[in-house]
Amino acid sequence: MEKSRMLWTFVERWLLALASWSWGLCRISLLPLIVTFHLYGGIILLLLIFVSIAGILYKFQDMLLYFPEQPSSSRLYVPMPTGIPHENIFIKTKDGVLLNLILLRYTGDNAAYSPTIIYFHGNAGNIGHRLPNALLMLVNLKVNLILVDYRGYGKSEGEASEEGLYIDSEAVLDYVMTRSDLDKTKIFLFGRSLGGAVAIHLASENSHRISAIMVENTFLSIPHMASTLFSFFPMRYLPLWCYKNKFLSYRKISQCRMPSLFISGLSDQLIPPVMMKQLYELSPARTKRLAIFPDGTHNDTWQCQGYFTALEQFIKEVIKSHSSEEMAKTSSNVTII
């Protein structure tokens, strides 16, 4: 019994000594921390706020960028065209995601030689919501249209991401190239808003397969948009790795040397119209056009007078320029409609 009491007393004293030594070490360590915070507390606080905001933005970036469920039921119901030739198509991407497409067929004169437009929509809704715009393209431009629902949108599977959208666009282009009933020498890309960034990426990687691109009310990059939308915080100083989605169109446009049409609505309240002008200026294309619509809003520029005329003139110019003599010429202009 006496031996057990002595052992317990020894252990108790040892634990007390260890606690006392640990507390002394804590006090010694605390001193430089107090001094550092006293001297640099403001800077440390700013850094903590900066890192916290960057972390929150990174985690919730997809929620801030992709809106596949707006308007409500967009994931459940996709309107289909009626009374016109069309196909409801499902294809698989290289990573196994099932995508839904709608092909609108032009059936008028010389339909076999009609251009095909691959249509990339914005960050909300589904392809069915773009049918009013697409049907007017079909009638006015005499083209085939393939409307694309990205992964996570409409009836397509998966979840949206930057890399995923790039894979989707590549899969759609590959699919178009397998269609013997579509003229592969007249493939046009059209992208509005987020779709413009997808179109620019696809064009930058496939210049040999794409005749021309047409982008409308799109942005330079997500970091540029973050600086615009969150101007109260110095977002421009955030490094690129803080952004889960980047969509660096201002860099990728340098690889798009095919004829390019930039469509800008000056009444766009979401994406600054100056970004469209900057993309136009950054474009190295020999044939490039900037069509400006003073009354054009972000989603409804296509309803402005002269919109389809601008697209029609551009498409005709591109088709005509297939001759090597025409392609050798460099031309650019700005049209205000």
From Swiss-Prot:
Pfam families: Abhydrolase_1. Its EC number is 3.-.-.-. The active site is at S193 (charge relay system), D268 (charge relay system), H298 (charge relay system). The gene is ABHD13. This is Protein ABHD13. GO terms for cellular component: membrane. Coiled coil: none annotated. Disulfide bonds: none annotated. One of its GO terms (molecular function) is palmitoyl-(protein) hydrolase activity. It is an enzyme of class 3 (hydrolase). It is found in: Membrane. It comes from Gallus gallus. Its main location: membrane. Belongs to the serine esterase family. Glycans are attached at N299. Residues 115-222 form the AB hydrolase-1 domain. The chain crosses the membrane at residues 37-57. It is a single-pass type II membrane protein. It comes from the Eukaryota. The lineage of its organism: Eukaryota, Metazoa, Chordata, Craniata, Vertebrata. InterPro entries: AB_hydrolase_1, AB_hydrolase_fold.
